[in-house]
Amino acid sequence: GAHPDFDCLTLLFQRPGQGGLQVCPGKDRESQQWTSIEPREEVITCNIGDMLMRWSDDQLPSNFHRVRNPLLHEYQGPRYSLAFFCQANKDVEILGP
């Protein structure tokens, strides 16, 4: 189902023609304004996570995202993607101004 990531940053590598990823800008899932992200060659999708939103004092909002099943006319075989989740070093203290 739809969810935000809890980490700092998620980088998503997808094959062209194998869409399904949708985002809902900001933390407002209630608006249901879902936007499809079409994968393209040499493009990396970057999702901001809750941790980076907190560090930025909500200046960089995390977003809800989901993967929907393809419609019959969209199906091009199995969908492959690779995600890289960037998390903070828990041994480091970050101080604000």
Where are each of the predicted segments found?
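Conserved, non-catalytic sequence blocks in retroelement Pol enzymes and Pol-derived host proteins
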Residues: G1
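Catalytic core of Fe(II)/2-oxoglutarate
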Residues: P4, Q14-P97
